[in-house]
Amino acid sequence: MENRNRNSRPIKNQDPVNEFIRAHQVLVIDEDKQNLGVMSKRQALEIAKSKNLDLYQVGVQPDGTVITRIVNFGKLKYEQQKKSKEAKKHQTKIENKEIRITVNIGKHDLETKARKAKEFLEEGSRVKVSLKFRGREVVYLDLGQQTLNNFFELVSDVGKMEKEAKLNGKFLDMYIVPKKN
C-alpha cells in the first residue's frame, strides 16, 4: 500500500513484504491466482504498486526460487488473525490442578483432598496427585503406592487414571482426568 511508512522494518518472525524480500528473482502470482512467471523483484514491486497492493513472500521452492503473491497485506493479516481467533474459540482448554499429599496422611484428610479433586474433575480439569516423601520415607514406596491407590478409589467415579504413579525425585506423581459422559 502507498501509505506504508518506508522507515518501518518488519518484525523478525514476520514474512517479508515488498522491499524486505531478499531475493532478486521472484515467481509472481497475482491477486486472481494467475501465475505471472519469474521476474525481477523490482518489476514485481512495480506491478504490485500499480495495483495499489503489496508483494508478499509466500514461500521458497526446492530449487531456491522465491514465491510471491500480489495481495492486500493488511487484509491478509486481518483474515489470518480472524481465523486463529476462531480456531482458539473452538479449542477446549484443559486446566491442570495439583493436589499434594504425604505417605502418612490421615483418612479424613485424604477424603477432604479427594473431595477437592472431585470438584476439579467435575469442572473438567486434569488433576495431578503428588505424594511427597520426606526424609527417608522414599524407602516406603509401596506404602506411597497404596496411599495413591486409596486416593484413586475415592475419585474413580468421576475420573480415570491417565498416567500410572511414577517416582519423580521425592514425589510419586499420578495423573487423573475427568471421565467422558
UniProtKB/Swiss-Prot annotation:
* Keyword Cytoplasm annotated: yes
Against NCBIfam families, the record matches this protein to: infC (TIGR00168)
Q: Where is the signal peptide?
A: none
Q: Which UniProt keywords apply?
A: Cytoplasm, Initiation factor, Protein biosynthesis
Domain of life per record: Bacteria
Q: Which organism is it from?
A: Mycoplasma capricolum subsp. capricolum (strain California kid / ATCC 27343 / NCTC 10154)
Compartments, as annotated in UniProt: Cytoplasm
Quaternary structure, per UniProt, is:
Monomer.
Pfam families for this protein: IF3_C, IF3_N
Q: What does this protein do?
A: IF-3 binds to the 30S ribosomal subunit and shifts the equilibrium between 70S ribosomes and their 50S and 30S subunits in favor of the free subunits, thus enhancing the availability of 30S subunits on which protein synthesis initiation begins.
Q: Which family does it belong to?
A: Belongs to the IF-3 family.
Q: What is its main location?
A: cytoplasm
Q: Which GO terms describe its biological process?
A: ribosome disassembly
User: Which GO terms of the cellular component aspect does the record hold?
Assistant: cytosol; membrane
InterPro entries in the record: T_IF-3_C_sf, T_IF-3_N_sf, Translation_initiation_fac3_CS, Translation_initiation_fac_3, Translation_initiation_fac_3_C, Translation_initiation_fac_3_N
Under what name is this protein listed?
A: Translation initiation factor IF-3
A single MF term (Gene Ontology): translation initiation factor activity
Q: What is the lineage of its organism?
A: Bacteria, Bacillati, Mycoplasmatota, Mollicutes, Mycoplasmataceae
